[in-house]
Design a protein with these regions (language model features):
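N-terminal amphipathic alpha-helix/helix-capping segment at the start of soluble metabolic enzymes
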Residues: 1-31, 173, 180-184
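Short beta-strand/loop segments at the ligand-binding rim of alpha/beta enzyme cores
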Residues: 21-23, 93-102, 118-119, 185-189
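Conserved, mostly hydrophobic/aromatic
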Residues: 27, 52, 56, 102, ...
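Conserved anion-binding
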Residues: 29-31, 67-70, 109, 115, ...
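Glycine-rich, proline-tolerant flexible connector loops at the mouths of alpha/beta enzymes
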Residues: 33-35, 58-85
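Glycine-rich anion/phosphate-binding loops
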Residues: 34-53, 78-82, 125-130, 166-172
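Alpha-helix-loop-beta-strand connector modules within alpha/beta enzyme cores
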Residues: 72-101, 106-110, 137-148, 170
Length: 191
């Protein structure tokens, strides 16, 4: 049985073929990321991005708030201060690059897209900010929905599943339905 080929995704006025896997390079503009080698300032972000793109990354994902288990939430203003200069610099240096903003906050998503990001990667799938899904629908950008129980502060405290595969599948189906109800096209969703 063959799988259907997904429709291309429109990103930065170009169609992106998602028939195969795409490598996403991670650029953390945060001092407390769980992956120390990905923590960067603006100049280092430009060097890291160039290397990642040369090595085949199709997407560069910029985050300014750690989502590692137990991470303490940073203020929205601090997250904006961390990510916007990086997004702006990457957009200037690599205008064809597919930039993703890793955030669960709708304001950060909106500002980052205005600065040059072309995709929103949301660990909360719209549950940590009630305005996220409507904002993404308004922005008309691809939206990465992820699964997490609780918040980064609590997600590993006592995760409980009776049937993890079915429960995660049900969760993601509910979030897909919420995105569709808000007007996000199916071919703009990444699960």
């Amino acid at each position: 049985m063959s799988r259907p080929t997904p429709d291309p995704m429109r990103v930065k006025d170009r169609l992106r073929d998602l028939a195969g896997p795409a490598v996403m390079g991670i650029i953390n503009a945060t001092p407390d990321s769980f992956h120390a080698a990905s923590r960067v300032d603006v100049d280092e972000a430009l060097r890291v991005a160039e290397r990642m793109l040369n090595e085949g990354a199709a997407i560069l994902d910029i985050g300014g708030a750690s989502s590692r288990p137990g991470a303490v939430a940073v203020a929205e203003t601090e997250e904006l201060k961390r990510v916007l200069p990086v997004v702006e610099a990457l957009q200037r240096r690599f205008p064809e690059a597919w930039l993703s903003i890793d955030t669960y906050r709708s304001t950060v998503a909106r500002e980052a897209v205005a600065a040059g990001a072309s995709m929103v990667n949301d660990i909360g799938a719209g549950l940590l900010d009630a305005n996220m899904i409507p904002t993404v629908a308004m922005l008309h950008v691809p939206y990465v929905l992820m699964h997490m129980q609780g918040t980064p502060q609590t997600m590993q405290a006592n995760p409980q599943y009776h049937n993890i595969v079915h429960e995660v599948k049900d969760f993601l189906q509910q979030r897909i339905q919420a995105a569709a109800a808000a007007g996000i096209a199916e071919n703009r969703l990444v699960i």
